[in-house]
Amino acid sequence: LRVTRRGFLKLLAGGASILALSRLISMKGRADVVRPPGAIVEEHFNSLCLRCEVCLEVCPSKAIVLAGLEDGISAANTPKIDPLRGPCEFLVGRCQDSMRCTKECPTGALQPVGRDEIKLGSVELDRERCIAWLETGECLVCDEVCPVLGAISINEDLKPVFHEDKCVGCGTCVYACPADPKALVLLPRGARRVAWPR
């Protein structure tokens, strides 16, 4: 069996394509994204969301962005919260009384909800990046900007401690974190989703 250079390159390209396709297929069910307020349960969210981007357009802090392929095929081009772009201001700020994303969603993938019903996820602290925990300086920015009483406490060593049961996942602390790279990450862990049909 004699393989030409062209034949070898075709085999190599074919193998790379199969590898890429298998990676995409393995990401299909993955949906580790933080959804905007009022998001219905994930199994119905992806089928109901038109990917129309209305929620992105009306978000005053531009915290809502489109999920990419890295978030899974089923989640691709659906809205997610990116606290690096801005916090979700449903508690304080420009959005606290309107939550236009929930009111203007044409399909009901985002449902109007009360502020006290919202839990987008939880923030996780990486002590190896946190300025206060590294003792490279004093920093309590996360505690200073957090709009939820008791979500962050300061221990006796003047270091922030996060309380998942109180955190609502607005991402205000993530956005404000001065560490580079950020010491905080917003995860969908503990997110409260709206039952569907309601």
Predicted regions located by residue number:
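Non-ligating segments of multi-cofactor redox enzymes
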Residues: L1-R198
